[in-house]
């Protein structure tokens, strides 16, 4: 991993010069960033992320942050003596777990992110999908990946019905940085826990984002031998689903990324959140990180 503080001044100047055409290219464009993994738990990486987001805003790019919080939810459940359960990468969410999820995501995790961005000189505003009627949802009907006739009950896990981006756009226009917790609401005002990767992908589509970037704890999508796959097409992804290469928590991430690519998001990247300042390196330099998802 590269520590930016150890880069020589001349090299830093070259990086800044390299960034100029990308700043011109992406000025006024929206970038949706799924923030999760080690980048959320390592203090140095947290600071790097906040600085990257603020700098993007300062140069005229509009970052929108959608955050996860799996480790924090697991820690809260453990403190309360409740065991987490997952089916095909989705957290089973009963009523009690839903209350914990809302408290952890909409409170603890979100406010930490907002505070870090504001401390770095930005103007972050925390939202959940309830705010401004942003994310309408319904109970997710989860079918088995290999047997479509088999259905799982995952409780208050939501499937997105619609996203109204008007509150996000209003914040962007006023120089704010939206930080969104992946919680939706149903027709009876019930809350739904929605996978953050799915929310980020759908929001990127609705906002007509230039890029969708998903930060992970690994270098990108790996084959069964552990080698990085730098580019993936829809057909290749189908093959990786079928042979089990993509499984667990990667399932909703890759499915969401592919849906966004098919729906017009210009580029979709799954990148290594363990790399310091990976957002700036991915967006504003010639360097490429992780896996790029293509619709064809």
UniProtKB/Swiss-Prot annotation:
> Which pathway does the record list?
Amino-acid biosynthesis; L-arginine biosynthesis; N(2)-acetyl-L-ornithine from L-glutamate: step 2/4
Q: What is its main location?
A: cytoplasm
**Which Gene3D superfamilies does the record cross-reference, listed alphabetically?**
Acetylglutamate kinase-like
UniProt keywords (A-Z) are: Amino-acid biosynthesis, Arginine biosynthesis, ATP-binding, Cytoplasm, Kinase, Nucleotide-binding, Transferase
Concerning CDD domains, the annotation shows: AAK_NAGK-C
Enzyme class, first EC level, given as a word: transferase
Q: Which GO cellular component does the record give, naming just one?
A: cytoplasm
InterPro entries with a match to the protein in the record: AceGlu_kinase-like_sf, AcgluKinase_fam, ArgB, Asp/Glu/Uridylate_kinase, Glu/AcGlu_kinase, NAGK-C
Reaction(s) catalysed (UniProt annotation): N-acetyl-L-glutamate + ATP = N-acetyl-L-glutamyl 5-phosphate + ADP
Q: What does this protein do?
A: Catalyzes the ATP-dependent phosphorylation of N-acetyl-L-glutamate.
| Family matches, as PANTHER family | N-ACETYLGLUTAMATE SYNTHASE, N-ACETYLGLUTAMATE SYNTHASE, MITOCHONDRIAL
What is the name of the protein in this document? Acetylglutamate kinase
């Amino acid at each position: 991993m590269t520590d930016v503080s150890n880069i020589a001044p001349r090299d830093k100047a070259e990086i800044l010069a390299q960034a100029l055409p990308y700043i011109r290219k992406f000025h006024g464009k929206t970038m949706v960033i799924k923030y999760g993994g080690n980048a959320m738990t390592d203090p140095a990486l947290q600071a790097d992320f906040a600085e990257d987001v603020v700098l993007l805003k300062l140069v005229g790019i509009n970052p929108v942050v959608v955050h996860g919080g799996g480790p924090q939810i697991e820690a809260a459940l453990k403190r309360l003596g409740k065991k987490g359960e997952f089916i095909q990468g989705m957290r089973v969410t009963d009523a009690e777990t839903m209350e914990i999820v809302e408290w952890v995501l909409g409170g603890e995790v979100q406010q930490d992110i907002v505070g870090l961005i504001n401390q770095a000189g930005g103007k972050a505003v925390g939202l959940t999908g309830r705010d401004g009627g942003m994310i309408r949802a319904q109970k997710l009907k989860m079918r088995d990946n290999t047997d479509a006739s088999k259905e799982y009950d995952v409780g208050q896990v939501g499937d997105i019905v619609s996203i109204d981006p008007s509150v996000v756009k209003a914040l962007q226009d006023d120089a704010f940085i939206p930080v969104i917790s992946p919680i939706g609401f149903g027709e009876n005002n019930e809350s739904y826990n929605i996978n953050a990767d799915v929310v980020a992908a759908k929001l990127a589509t609705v906002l007509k984002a230039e890029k969708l970037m998903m930060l992970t704890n690994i270098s990108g999508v790996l084959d069964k031998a552990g080698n990085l796959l730098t580019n993936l097409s829809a057909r290749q992804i189908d093959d990786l689903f079928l042979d089990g290469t993509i499984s667990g928590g990667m399932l909703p991430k890759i499915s969401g990324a592919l849906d966004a690519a098919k729906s017009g998001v210009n580029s979709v990247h799954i990148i290594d959140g363990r790399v310091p300042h990976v957002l700036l390196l991915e967006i504003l330099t010639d360097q490429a990180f992780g896996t790029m998802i293509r619709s064809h």
